[in-house]
């Protein structure tokens, strides 16, 4: 596609809660424990993609449009009901929260590779990552013309069939597609298909669809928003306090300070199980109800966890 489509594309992110839940839970913990921390981080394209001309300009325009977002009373009411573990002061903070386009700036080099630099307080920029990734993903489909060829009816059928396969075979599943989606509409279609499949086959399924990471879509379909934390929380602490040695210990302590026993599934593998095990005391093992396996062989990791406990 030609550069002149930049500037004509509608706003991609239209709701403050069109984001993954764990960005809000981590933002709350960061504000509570590290309100003055300054961060700098960079977008990395693992595939070294060459983006169309004008792509970075449109990314910047879409980031600028985020400044218009304001959390609504309906969004806050939903989160207070479903995300009861988030302290009420956080919603007061969110009522006054506004994005600033200066926190993230995109550019392209002469070869067309995309660069995005994030700068600012951790408490503020933490709510940009997933939204910016969703913008990049959707714009890529628009700029390459793939979005115009998308068959939404077929996609619904495929999503419904996938849900049926998992649910009929006893799987417990949730949807985590915000940063990877081809568009907000396609993610909504996928979540809707999973919801409908679960409802239509309620007497036959042995599995369950427990929710989505996307808070806005959870509100739209009245399901549970899913998520606790990302590696970012542990790695950010490691960056501030001298590396991985005590990062898990401090992350668990700060998480407990904010959530007082709620949200007790800990993401342990930022620096591997052995480093985590050095920091996981008996009190931590008793207070965190579960561990999230996010790397390595699941069975091998599960055996390590069982032996440790």
Positions of the model-derived regions?
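Ordered alpha/beta subdomains of enzyme catalytic regions
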Residues: 1-251, 256-258, 282
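Glycine- and Gly-Pro-enriched alpha-helical subdomains that act as flexible
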Residues: 224-304, 308-309
């Amino acid at each position: 596609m030609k550069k002149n489509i930049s500037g004509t594309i509608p706003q991609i992110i239209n709701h403050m809660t069109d984001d993954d839940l764990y960005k809000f839970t981590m933002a709350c913990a960061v504000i509570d424990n590290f309100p003055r921390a300054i961060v700098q981080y960079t977008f990395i394209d693992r595939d070294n993609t060459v983006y169309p001309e004008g792509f970075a300009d449109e990314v910047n325009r879409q980031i600028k449009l985020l400044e218009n977002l304001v959390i609504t009373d309906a969004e806050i009411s939903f989160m207070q009901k479903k995300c009861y573990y988030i302290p009420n002061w956080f919603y007061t903070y969110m009522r006054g929260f506004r994005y600033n386009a200066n926190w993230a700036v995109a550019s392209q080099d002469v070869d067309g590779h995309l660069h995005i630099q994030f700068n600012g307080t951790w408490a503020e920029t933490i709510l940009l990552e997933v939204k910016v990734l969703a913008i990049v993903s959707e714009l890529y489909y628009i700029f390459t013309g793939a979005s115009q060829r998308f068959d939404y009816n077929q996609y619904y059928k495929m999503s419904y069939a996938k849900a049926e396969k998992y649910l009929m075979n006893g799987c417990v599943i949730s949807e985590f597609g915000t940063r990877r989606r081809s568009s907000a509409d396609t993610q909504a279609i996928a979540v809707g298909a999973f919801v409908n499949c679960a409802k239509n086959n309620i007497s036959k399924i042995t599995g369950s669809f427990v929710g989505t990471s996307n808070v806005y879509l959870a509100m739209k379909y009245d399901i549970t928003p899913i998520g606790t934390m990302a590696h970012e929380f542990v790695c950010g602490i490691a960056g501030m306090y001298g590396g991985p040695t005590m990062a898990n210990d401090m992350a668990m302590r700060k998480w407990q300070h904010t959530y007082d026993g709620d949200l007790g599934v800990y993401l342990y593998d930022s620096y591997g199980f052995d480093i985590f095990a050095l920091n996981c005391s008996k009190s931590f093992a008793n207070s965190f109800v579960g561990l999230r396996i996010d790397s390595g062989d699941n069975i091998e990791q599960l055996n390590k966890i069982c032996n440790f406990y």
